[in-house]
Amino acid sequence: MATNTSSNLLTNPYTEREKKLIDEAYYRDLKYNLTSKSRWKFIGDVSETLSQICVGTSSVLAFASGFFEDIDILAFVAGTVGVGSLVLLQFSSYAMKESSERTQQVNVILTKLGLETIPDIVVEPSIIKARLQGELGEQENDVVIEV
């Protein structure tokens, strides 16, 4: 009975086929996760921007509803826009979390392949605040922007 040595494994046609399939799977996963990472980051940025616009609009409408007392619908619209702002802000947080998750998935594959990892460009506001207060040091793979 023959034993499999490392030289036999390298020349084995099944091993080469399997290696090719695994490499293709890694490539597909990297491509998908990099695209998803960018897409979720964009969605998060847009959602957060829209949320801030809604907060401003809601504030103006709330003020206007007190000034124009005969237009009852203004208070309702102000409240509705304010709630919409909260929904958009929560969705933005979800999208940023998804972007970070995709970055982690990409980094797992890159590490497995022996390649350099990419930094996570999403930093939660609580982390920024803690760093500014000196509570946390720099973390691996974080992009720190001095303010």
Swiss-Prot record:
Keywords: Host membrane, Membrane, Transmembrane, Transmembrane helix, Virion. The chain crosses the membrane at residues 71-91. It is a single-pass membrane protein. GO terms for cellular component: host cell membrane; membrane; virion component. It is found in: Virion; Host membrane. It comes from the Viruses. This is Uncharacterized protein R695. The lineage of its organism: Viruses, Varidnaviria, Bamfordvirae, Nucleocytoviricota, Megaviricetes.
